[in-house]
Structure formats: C-alpha cells, structure tokens
C-alpha cells in the first residue's frame, strides 16, 4: 500500500460510505440516529452529544505510549517523541526516553494510575505549549492519523454530519490528544484530556481536576451536558472496563431521555464483560485502520 500523503486532509473529508469499516459501524450509526430522531421529534432544538475515549477507541494503540504488536514497534508515543525532541527538562535524549518509558512511567502506573497519567503531561513542564502543539499536530498529520480505526472515524463523522456533537474524554495529556483536532475535523473545545495549567504560554506542573479517567470521565460528561441548553448524551464509546466503563454505563442507565429514546454505548476490543457490565454495552471487535498498517 502506498504511503499516505496529507493524511489529515484525507480523514477530514471521509464521510458516510466513503470510508471502509467493519459491519457494526452502520448498525451503531443507525441505532444512535434513530434515538436522535425520537428526541428531536419532541425537542426540536435538542443538542445530541456523543462521548469518545481516544486511545484504543479512536486510534489503534495509545497516543501517549505508542503501539507495539508482536514485539515490533508500530509507532512511538507522544511522550517518547516529546522527550527525544527536547520538550522535557527532566528526561533527555534516548537514555531519558528509555528511563521514562520502560521504568518510571510503567512502575508508577502499576500501583497509582492517578499519579502516572498526570506525569505524562508534567514531564513537559517549562516548554512552550504552542511549540508542543505544533509538534504534536505534525505527528498526527504525518503518521498518527493513519492509525485511526476506520470504523470509529466513520461513526464519528456520520454522527457529526447528522448534527451529533462529538466530545473526546481521554486519560492522555490534553496537549497530545488536542493535536488530533485537524485530522478528526473537531473544534478544540471538544477535547478533554489530562490538563495542566499554562502560565504565560509555558506548561506548568499544576494539574486541573477532575482527571478524565474512570469516574472523572463521567463527571466531565455530566458537566458538559448540564452546560449545554437542551443537551443530551446519546452515545458513548470506549475500550476499557477499568477506564471507560463508568461513563459508558452512565449513558445507558441515565434518567430517561425524551420520547422513549435510549443512550447507546459501544465497547471496542474490551474482551469479556465483567458481571457488573454484562449486557449493558454493544461489544465489538475492530482492527481495520485508515492508513497503511499492513504492508
């Protein structure tokens, strides 16, 4: 397969049937839009919203830590790339990147995710946010966007075309996931990641809460819905029963939506549901990506 050129422009232009996807994509699009139709029949100015995890849900792999398959690195994550390109005062060069990626971060994550996830953003302390953004946007344009799941992009674009407002809820640094805005065709204010305070254009170590992980994702979702006149959460997408299941469950068990409409939640490549979540979500497997993952 030929290398994609200008992959960002390619993805933004893909809508409806123009993007190959697994069979479940059409099913979930139809289900969500039928429920949107029910809501708008009685609330014409309703604002239907869909909420998406990012890593493993929209992109195959993890924007922060990358993707490794069968012992082969498919792409390096933004954390490693940021270190290698001088955006961290704490970790320098190949040695620093290896220390962070193979020791410090996985060790901390093994017993304290609530500390490990913010660390991915805090290592950027002292760098200019605009320079990090330029760098990360370029990574998406040149390579990361080719790892988007075809089905996820197709669903997201079809919902957006139909007037559903898509929001991102990610436990990766917001500086990383925000860089996907151009390739996904979403405005910047739809992205919610691990957020650090920016002081005079410079990244600080101060974390803003709640963290968009586990119950924090649900809290952010509810805040967005409450702040949107006639806003309704109609869909949720995730891939982890640990990180995402709470907000997915909220969407399908929330107080009744107008006119008998129901929320739809899709778990992607999540494996066997734990008993507490059995039967709640549409569980699917997907692997096809937009770009040249297979050669």
Question: Predicted regions span which residues?
Answer:
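Preference for short coil/turn "hinge" residues that link or interrupt alpha-helices
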Residues: 12, 117-120, 179
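C-terminal cap/substrate-recognition subdomain and adjoining C-terminal extension
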Residues: 24-31, 42, 47-49, 129-167, ...
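A metal-dependent, Asp-based hydrolase signature
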Residues: 64, 70-154
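Sec-dependent N-terminal signal peptides
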Residues: 4-13
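Conserved cytosolic headpiece of P-type ATPases
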Residues: 53-55, 61, 65, 73-79, ...
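Non-catalytic pre-domain segments flanking phosphatase-related domains
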Residues: 11, 17-54, 59-62, 69
């Amino acid at each position: 397969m030929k290398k994609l050129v200008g992959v960002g422009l390619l993805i933004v232009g893909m809508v409806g049937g123009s993007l190959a996807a697994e069979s479940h994509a059409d099913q979930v699009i139809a289900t969500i839009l039928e429920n949107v139709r029910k809501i708008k029949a009685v609330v014409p100015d309703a604002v239907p919203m869909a909420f998406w995890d990012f890593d493993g849900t929209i992109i195959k792999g993890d924007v922060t830590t990358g993707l490794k398959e069968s012992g082969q690195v498919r792409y390096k994550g933004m954390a490693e790339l940021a270190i290698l390109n001088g955006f961290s005062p704490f970790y320098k060069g190949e040695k620093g990147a290896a220390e962070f990626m193979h020791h410090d971060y996985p060790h901390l994550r093994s017993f304290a995710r609530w500390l490990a996830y913010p660390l991915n953003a805090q290592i950027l302390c002292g760098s200019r946010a605009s320079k990090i953004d330029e760098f990360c946007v370029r990574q998406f344009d040149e390579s990361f966007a080719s790892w988007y799941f075809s089905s996820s992009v197709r669903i997201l674009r079809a919902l957006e075309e139909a007037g559903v407002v898509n929001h991102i809820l990610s436990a990766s640094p917001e500086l990383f996931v925000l860089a996907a805005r151009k390739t996904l065709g979403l405005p910047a204010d739809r992205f919610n990641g691990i957020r650090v305070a920016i002081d005079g254009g410079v990244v600080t170590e101060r974390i803003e809460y709640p963290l968009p992980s586990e119950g924090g994702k649900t809290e952010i979702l509810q805040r967005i819905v409450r702040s949107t006149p006639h806003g309704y959460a109609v869909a949720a997408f995730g891939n982890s029963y640990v990180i995402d299941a709470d907000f997915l469950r909220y969407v399908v068990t929330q107080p009744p939506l107008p006119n008998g409409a129901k929320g739809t939640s899709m778990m992607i490549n999540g494996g066997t549901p734990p008993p507490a979540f059995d039967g709640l979500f549409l569980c699917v497997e997907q692997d096809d990506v937009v770009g040249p993952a297979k050669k």
